[in-house]
């Protein structure tokens, strides 16, 4: 199946032809069916829950420690066990989604989240508290990759980027809401509130469609066209789309008939997409995201900025960047937003490093706090614009259905380990050198900019089958890359 190249140097604007505007309006209209909207709402709920889960511990720390008589070590373990759950969820997410399907996996993640919140809400000691947090981590580890996959496999090509980008906004909404509510609501009540999204979603899961690409993969070809009709509208002609999905699925199966299991992912033909997915998804973590997120108060305090003002402004900027990303991702494209976002995060890290250097050497004392505040705002705004949602969008687009589960496991595992590494080491790095720490983060983002410019293709406007075949058909070698 020969397709045009997706290499950056040959990228074209597939929506630039005169007839594309009417086609785009038609696809948007067709996509606005009840099953599509319902599926999008349900599929994105994992991101909303993720934001609530991450935002829960900061405002509730003192009250939980007081009520349950916990030590600092107890609460630190409660906070960090989420990462253990993330890693466990990452290890099983791909196999689970491939084995039982996208919808049943969403069932499992929402049940885990619900049990986790209830365990925390009714905890009498640290053991039940930790169990609830662990279950939440497993759920997030699964849903953080499953959500973008499910949305990308259902959405029409012209809405795929915007629909997936909205998931990052849901994370921000959940995070901001729980930060705000946590100052006014008791920690047990806040946990009950956290269970509401799952309680709403569970009955809706009876009415959402399974991914047509997963149906094709498991041999349920007769159901593919019916699902597409429900998603695009009963009057839509989905025969070409259904034929493309079925043809490409058979094409992949014929190529890999002698290759089975997890290690199929490590064939040479998957080397480039695997590298792109792993690097892009881990880059924000290695570029200091968790350091900024969990230790913003430390950064502001060290440079003389009011943490309350800093948090409010950075939240507004990040949400604004996220909204702009949703609006622009299917217009300007993934690659250009990635480059702009990486450049902004690089400048934010660099400016933060300079502000620490000036503060340490007692230079420009009146301007250093303002510089620190602006640098953090630039970092978070740039992250929300591109590096937040787009790596997950691209990772959900570039892998064929037969290795998508394995790729999800690898990408999720790498980002979970990267997240833990930066979170664990950040305070030690600050003690070593505040300036040096943020210079390291700036270096990561600078290298990421070069990586994206050289290797990351533009996927805007392409069908999933076009994107995937452009990678996998570039070589017929089946030898592994290690």
From Swiss-Prot:
GO molecular-function terms, A-Z: sugar transmembrane transporter activity
Transmembrane segments: 36-56, 72-92, 103-123, 134-154, 166-186, 189-209, 271-291, 309-329, 337-357, 370-390, 410-430, 436-456
CDD domains: MFS_GLUT6_8_Class3_like
Primary site of residence: membrane
Membrane recorded as keyword: yes
A cellular component term, taken from the record's GO annotations: membrane
Keyword Protein biosynthesis on entry: no
SUPFAM superfamilies found in the cross-reference section: MFS general substrate transporter
Keywords for this protein: Membrane, Sugar transport, Transmembrane, Transmembrane helix, Transport
Signal peptide extent: none
Membrane topology: Multi-pass membrane protein
Pfam family, one: Sugar_tr
Cellular localization per UniProt: Membrane
PROSITE patterns: MFS (PS50850), SUGAR_TRANSPORT_2 (PS00217)
Region (Disordered): 1-20
Purpose of the protein: Sugar transporter.
Protein family per UniProt: Belongs to the major facilitator superfamily. Sugar transporter (TC 2.A.1.1) family.
Full protein name: Sugar transporter ERD6-like 14
Organism of derivation: Arabidopsis thaliana (Mouse-ear cress)
């Amino acid at each position: 199946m020969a397709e045009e190249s997706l290499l950056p140097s040959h990228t074209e604007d597939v929506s630039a032809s005169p007839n594309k505007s009417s086609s785009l309006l038609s696809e948007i209209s067709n996509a606005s069916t009840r099953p599509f909207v319902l599926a999008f709402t349900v599929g994105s709920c994992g991101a909303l829950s993720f934001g609530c889960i991450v935002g829960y511990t900061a405002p509730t720390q003192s009250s939980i420690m007081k009520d349950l008589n916990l030590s600092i070590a107890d609460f630190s373990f409660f906070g960090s066990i989420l990462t253990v759950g993330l890693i466990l969820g990452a290890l099983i997410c791909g196999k689970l989604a491939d084995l039982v399907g996208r919808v049943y996996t969403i069932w499992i993640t929402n049940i885990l989240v619900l049990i986790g919140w209830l365990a925390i809400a009714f905890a009498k000691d640290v053991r039940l508290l930790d169990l609830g947090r662990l279950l939440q981590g497993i759920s997030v580890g699964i849903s953080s990759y499953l959500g973008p996959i499910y949305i990308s496999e259902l959405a029409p090509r012209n809405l795929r980027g915007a629909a997936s980008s909205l998931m990052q906004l849901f994370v921000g909404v959940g995070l901001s809401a729980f930060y705000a509510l946590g100052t006014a609501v008791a920690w047990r009540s806040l946990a009950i509130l956290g269970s509401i999204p799952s309680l709403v979603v569970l009955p809706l899961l009876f009415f959402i469609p399974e991914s047509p690409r997963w149906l094709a993969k498991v041999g349920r070809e007769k159901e593919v066209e019916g699902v597409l009709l429900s998603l695009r509208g009963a009057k839509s002609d989905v025969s070409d789309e259904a034929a493309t999905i079925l043809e490409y699925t058979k094409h992949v199966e014929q190529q890999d008939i002698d290759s089975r299991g997890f290690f199929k992912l490590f064939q040479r033909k998957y080397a480039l997409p695997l590298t792109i997915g792993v690097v892009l998804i881990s880059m924000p973590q290695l570029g200091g995201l968790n350091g900024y997120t969990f230790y913003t108060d430390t950064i502001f305090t060290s440079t003389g900025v009011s943490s309350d003002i800093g948090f409010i402004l950075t939240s507004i900027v990040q949400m604004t960047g996220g909204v702009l990303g949703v609006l622009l991702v299917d217009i300007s494209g993934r690659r250009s937003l990635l480059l702009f976002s990486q450049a902004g995060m690089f400048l934010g890290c660099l400016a933060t490093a300079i502000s620490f250097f000036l503060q340490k050497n007692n230079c420009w004392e009146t301007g250093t706090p303002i510089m620190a505040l602006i640098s953090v705002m630039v970092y978070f705004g740039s992250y929300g614009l591109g590096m937040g949602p787009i790596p997950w969008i691209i990772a959900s687009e570039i892998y064929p259905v037969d290795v998508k589960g394995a790729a999800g496991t690898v990408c999720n595992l790498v980002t979970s380990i990267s997240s833990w590494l930066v979170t664990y080491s950040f305070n030690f790095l600050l003690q070593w050198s505040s300036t040096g720490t943020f210079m390291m983060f700036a270096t990561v983002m600078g290298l990421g900019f070069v990586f994206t410019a050289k290797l990351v293709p533009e996927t805007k406007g392409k069908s999933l089958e076009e994107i995937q075949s452009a990678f996998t058909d570039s070589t017929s070698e089946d030898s592994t890359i290690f």
